[in-house]
Amino acid sequence: MPTLTVRRRTLPKAKRHWDAAQVKALRAFLGMTQQMFANELGVRQQTVSEWEKGIYRPRGASVTLLNQIADNAGFKHPDDK
């Protein structure tokens, strides 16, 4: 099972917006199932599914983790300038 390394670093002031398509794109970029991705984020698989369906959006600590994971993996988010 792949593991992700999260390093502490200062995030850019511009806030990324994680919509359904971006969450799914990051997960696919990492080659993870919803369950694997959920385990790394410390959320339920159902939560990842709901994010990817647009029922809910990530917020708070989940957004911070998504930003760190995306940065560490070299994922290009559309909000990055």
Regions found by a protein language model. Give the residues of each.
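Residue-level signal for the short linker/turn that defines the boundary of a DNA-recognition helix
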Residues: 18-21, 31-32
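Non-catalytic, surface-exposed connector residues within folded enzymatic/regulatory domains
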Residues: 17, 59-60
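Key DNA-contacting residues within the recognition helix of helix-turn-helix
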Residues: 24, 49-50, 59, 67
